[in-house]
């Protein structure tokens, strides 16, 4: 009887633990791809909203710039670096005549939606002369955005490239 009780208690603890891990164990890092995708979409939308406010044409997604931005964001997150990519790399690999880049390192904030992070990032870029210049340049026609979380989970690394 005692063995049955111990087994039953052990099973309840195991099932409870699995349920807890299933509910709580999905951190933003584990749920990262969908959160990151929503943030990337939000960054493009926020950038276009801001560009429209200043009578600039909106930019459309470009798969080459997108892949390059995603790869660079992952590289920066994994290596704990915060530097711009050589623009010649983007110009050549994506066959473009003009390109600019904005990067950001944004602290993770529990409960903050991907859309809120995206809007806040664009708002902060608008407060910086160089980032603002890139964001409002009349030259770009296309955009690529990449987002990656640092291994410690403390930051989102954001890369936005716009080109012509």
Predicted regions and their residues:
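Generic alpha-helix initiation/capping and coil-helix boundary signal
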Residues: 3, 9-10, 62, 66, ...
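Single, functionally critical "micro-switch" positions that shape active/binding sites
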Residues: 26, 50, 127
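A short, structure-level motif marking secondary-structure boundaries and short turns
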Residues: 31-34, 116-117
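Short, well-ordered surface patches within globular domains
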Residues: 33-91, 138-144
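A well-ordered secondary-structure block
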Residues: 89-163
């Amino acid at each position: 009887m005692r063995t049955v009780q111990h087994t039953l208690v052990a099973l309840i603890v195991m099932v409870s633990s699995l349920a807890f891990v299933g509910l709580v164990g999905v951190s933003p890092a584990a749920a990262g791809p969908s959160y990151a995708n929503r943030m990337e979409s939000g960054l493009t939308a926020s950038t276009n909203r801001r560009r429209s406010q200043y009578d600039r044409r909106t930019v459309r997604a470009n798969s080459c710039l997108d892949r390059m931005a995603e790869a660079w964001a992952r590289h920066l997150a994994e290596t704990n670096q915060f530097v711009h990519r050589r623009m010649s790399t983007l110009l050549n690999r994506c066959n473009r005549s003009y390109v600019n880049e904005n990067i950001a390192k944004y602290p993770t904030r529990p409960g903050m939606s991907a859309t809120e992070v995206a809007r806040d990032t664009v708002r902060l870029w608008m407060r910086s002369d160089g980032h603002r210049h890139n964001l409002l340049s009349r030259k770009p026609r296309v955009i690529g955005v990449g987002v990656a979380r640092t291994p410690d989970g403390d930051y989102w690394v954001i890369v936005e490239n716009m080109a012509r």
